[in-house]
Amino acid sequence: MDKKKYIITLDEGTTSCRSIVFDKQAKIVSVAQNEFTQYFPQSGWVEHDPLEIWNTQLSTMQSVKNKAQIKSVNVEAVGITNQRETVVLWNKETGLPVYNAIVWQDRRTSEYCETLTKHVDKVREKTGLIINPYFSGTKIRWILKNVPLAQKTLKAGKLLAGTIDSWLIWKLTGGKVHATDVSNASRTLLFNIHTMDWDQELLDLFEIPRSILPEVKSSSEVYGYVEPSLWSQRATAKVPITGVAGDQQSALFGQLCLKPGMVKNTYGTGCFTLMNIGEKPIMSKNKLLTTVAWKLGKKKPVYALEGSVFIAGAAVQWIRDGLRLIYDAAESDFYANLASKQDTHQVYLVPSFTGLGAPYWDSYSRGAIFGLERGTKKEHIIKATLESIVFQTNDLIKAMSSDVGKKIEVVKVDGGATRSEYIMQFQSSISGVNVIRPKNIESTALGATFLAGLAVGYWKDLKELEKLVKVDKEFKPKLDKEKVEKLVHGWNVAVKRTFNWMKEVDLK
C-alpha cells in the first residue's frame, strides 16, 4: 500500500468547486472540478445554493482522492481556499441554509451602503475596506432584515453565519467547528484588522449579533478534523483541516510573495492584484483596500494592499455564452491577434456588468463598448474584451505604485487567463512591468496547500517552499511609450463614460 502522504486542497470558486491532490514537491497529482449553478433573481443580484456548493465540493474531494488512487490515511492534511465575501446563514441544528448564499458580486445593498456615508472614515480605519455592497457585512444584514426564516432561527438561538470557508469547515467537521481565518474575516466589514477580532462598534452599526459569527483563527493551524465517513464508508482516518485562506490571499502566499513590495495578479472570474506590505497596515490614497494577507500560527499577521476588478474572465465567458462570438475561451487569442494585424481602429469594452471595483468603486456603472465603426468585426470586440482585463489591472498596478511611492517592476501572475499569451504580453507592455508566469498556475490552491502543510510539519519552513515554485515564462514590455499612453488615454475616456449609468437612466 502507498505510504506516501499528500495534501488535498479544496478550492471553492465563484463558478466551480475543485479539489486538488498535491505531493511533497508541490506537484499536482490529480484534479477534480465541477461547476455549480449561478442564480440571478433580479438585476444586480447574484446567488448560489449553499447545499449545491457543499455537495459539489464534497464530490470533488471524494473523486480526487480516488483519481489519485490514495486512501484517507495517505492524506496528511486538508487545505481550504474560497471565494471571499460570499455569505451563508444556516440553522445549526438542521444544517440547512435559511437563504441562498449572497455572492460577492451581488449589488442589492447599494442603496443601504449610501446611507452610511458618515461612517466611511471610521469603517475604513478599523477594517481597511470601503463601505460597499461587495463585502459580507451588508449581505448578512440584508438576510437578517429580509428573510423571515433567518429572523425565526435567530430568535430560537440556532442561527450561524459565515463566509464559504466557515460553511465548508462546519460541514466537513460534522457541525463540530464554526470558524474562519483572518484573511476571510478581514473581508466582512465587521473585523478590526488592528485588534484582529470582530469589532463590537461595527457589529452594532450593521446590526449583526456576535453570537452568530465564527471564531477567528490563524491561516495555518489545526481547525478540526474531517468526518471520516465523508471520505468513504469504511474510512477511519482523522484528517486535520490545517490551512484556510480567502482565494486572493491564498494566491499571494502560493506565489511566495513573502517580502514587502512583492505583487501578484490573479486572472479569474474577476482580477485581483495584491501587494505584500509587511506587518504594518498602510491605508491607500487611491481607493485600494488594506486587507489581512495571512497569519502563520502565533506569528504576527501580514497585510496586503488589494485592488479588485469584478469582471475579468467573466467577460470572456460573456462573449462566449452570451454573445456567442467564440465557442471556446482558447480561441480568443487567435481573434485578438487577427484584429491586431488589421489595426484599423481601437475598440474599447468596459465590462462593468456589476459596477466598477477599484480604484473607481462605482456601483452604478454598467458595461459599454466604445469606438464602434462600420468596419468593426467580431475580432475587434474579442480583442477589446481581452484588453479590458489588462486595462483594469493596469489601473490597479498604477494605484499601488503611487501608494507605496515606487515603480512596480515585476508582477507574478496566476489564474485561468494567464494561458492567454495575448493578455500576458499586452499586460507587460501596457503596465511596463515584467510579467512572470509560474509553471503551476494554480497558485490559489497552492497557497492553501502550503498553509496546510506548514501547520503539520509537512514542509518545515518558508525556505523549503521557495525551492518548489518554478517559472514557466517571463513577458517583457514591447510597445513604445507613445503608443501605450495613447491606448491608456482611450481607456480612461471610455471608463469615465460609464460612470453612474444606472442612476442617470434609472433602469432598476
From Swiss-Prot:
Binding of sn-glycerol 3-phosphate, residues: 14, 84-85, 134, 247
Chain residues that bind glycerol: 84-85, 134, 247-248
Record gene name: glpK
CDD domains from the UniProt entry: FGGY_EcGK_like
Transmembrane regions listed in the UniProt entry: none
Record's catalysed reaction(s): glycerol + ATP = sn-glycerol 3-phosphate + ADP + H(+)
Molecular function GO labels: ATP binding; glycerol kinase activity
Gene3D superfamilies: 3.30.420.40
Protein family per UniProt: Belongs to the FGGY kinase family.
Documented activity regulation: Inhibited by fructose 1,6-bisphosphate (FBP).
An individual GO BP term: glycerol catabolic process
Function: Key enzyme in the regulation of glycerol uptake and metabolism. Catalyzes the phosphorylation of glycerol to yield sn-glycerol 3-phosphate.
HAMAP family registered for this protein in UniProt: Glycerol_kin (MF_00186)
UniProt cross-references to SUPFAM superfamilies, sorted A to Z: Actin-like ATPase domain (SSF53067)
Entry annotated with the keyword Nucleotide-binding: yes
Pathway: Polyol metabolism; glycerol degradation via glycerol kinase pathway; sn-glycerol 3-phosphate from glycerol: step 1/1
One cellular component term from this protein's GO annotations in UniProt: cytosol
Alphabetized InterPro entries for the sequence: ATPase_NBD, Carb_kinase_FGGY, Carb_kinase_FGGY_CS, FGGY_C, FGGY_N, Glycerol_kin
Protein name: Glycerol kinase
Name of one Pfam family that matches: FGGY_N
EC numbers on record: 2.7.1.30
Binding site for ATP: 14-16, 269, 313, 317, 416
Organism: Mycoplasmoides gallisepticum (strain R(low / passage 15 / clone 2))
Keyword set, alphabetical order: ATP-binding, Glycerol metabolism, Kinase, Nucleotide-binding, Transferase
Residues the entry annotates as binding ADP: 14, 18, 269, 313, 416
